[in-house]
Amino acid sequence: MNNKIVKVGNIEVANDKPFTLFGGMNVLESRDMAMRVCEQYVEVTNKLGVPYVFKASFDKANRSSIHSYRGPGMEEGLKIFQELKDTFGVNIITDVHEIYQCKPVAEVVDIIQLPAFLARQTDLVEAMARTGAVINVKKPQFLSPGQMGNIVEKIAECGNENVILCDRGTNFGYDNLVVDMLGFNIMKKVSKGCPVIFDVTHSLQCRDPFGAASGGRRDQVTELARSGMAIGLAGLFLEAHPDPNSAKCDGPSALPLSKLEAFVSQMKAIDDLVKSFEEIDTSN
């Protein structure tokens, strides 16, 4: 199988290239917090030689509760993103939820993300594709890995081949997620070699069936991330926070920012080792 290369600035994202870290925070909480988090990621990834893309949302439009924090909104969020780019020279990924957001967001950031809950909304998919931007497609929790090929086809029909696929866990009964490690290579195959990345943070969500916010299992983030990196992936999607217990969204799944260097160092070691192996064809 040929692995496609998707270029994000000067980064080549591909399943057989050194992994790219798509890291940041769940949602923009403030300009100062974004600067602090991005600076730490840049410092760590530069030190370790890991390609890096900053991630955060300007609007968490799918929060469970009407009272939950959503973010600063598109206009303010894009200003913060532009300042991060100007200050740190980073590439940026963020999600869109509405058709009208696609064009202005794609003019500022480098990758626009199709949220898992919206991945089958054809009009939104087409609007994103027509921007020509790189698109990161989150696999819906309710969709099999094999069905991701249909979403890639929709984007390709609009003339856009710049697609990354991302697994963020699959429903396991009510209010729980598991990660099917066999699904990563299925997504590679049905997409004809698109880069596949692993959102380890959101895969750790575990909901209170009667609560308004997601719980999480950040104490298991390292073991789950190690498992995913052993597959041989194009990238890892990670959220970290200086104080996860006070984070405005998904703190229970976020890596403490103080642990970032040790964590990324381990992921790089696994990626380097796995990609040094000769591929063994066991199909015959």
Curated annotation (Swiss-Prot):
Which pathway does this chain act in? Carbohydrate biosynthesis; 3-deoxy-D-manno-octulosonate biosynthesis; 3-deoxy-D-manno-octulosonate from D-ribulose 5-phosphate: step 2/3; Bacterial outer membrane biogenesis; lipopolysaccharide biosynthesis
* InterPro entries to which the protein is assigned, alphabetical: Aldolase_TIM (IPR013785), DAHP1/KDSA (IPR006218), KDO8P_synthase (IPR006269)
What is catalyzed by this enzyme?
Answer: D-arabinose 5-phosphate + phosphoenolpyruvate + H2O = 3-deoxy-alpha-D-manno-2-octulosonate-8-phosphate + phosphate
Compartment(s) where it occurs, according to its Swiss-Prot or TrEMBL record: Cytoplasm
Sorted alphabetically, which SUPFAM superfamilies does this protein's record hold?
Answer: Aldolase (SSF51569)
GO MF term list: 3-deoxy-8-phosphooctulonate synthase activity
- One of this protein's Pfam families, by short name? DAHP_synth_1
Q: What is the similarity comment for this entry?
A: Belongs to the KdsA family.
For this entry, the protein name equals: 2-dehydro-3-deoxyphosphooctonate aldolase
Q: Which UniProt keywords apply?
A: Cytoplasm, Lipopolysaccharide biosynthesis, Transferase
Q: GO terms for CC?
A: cytoplasm
Gene Ontology biological process terms, A to Z: keto-3-deoxy-D-manno-octulosonic acid biosynthetic process
Predominantly, its location class is cytoplasm
What's the EC number here? 2.5.1.55
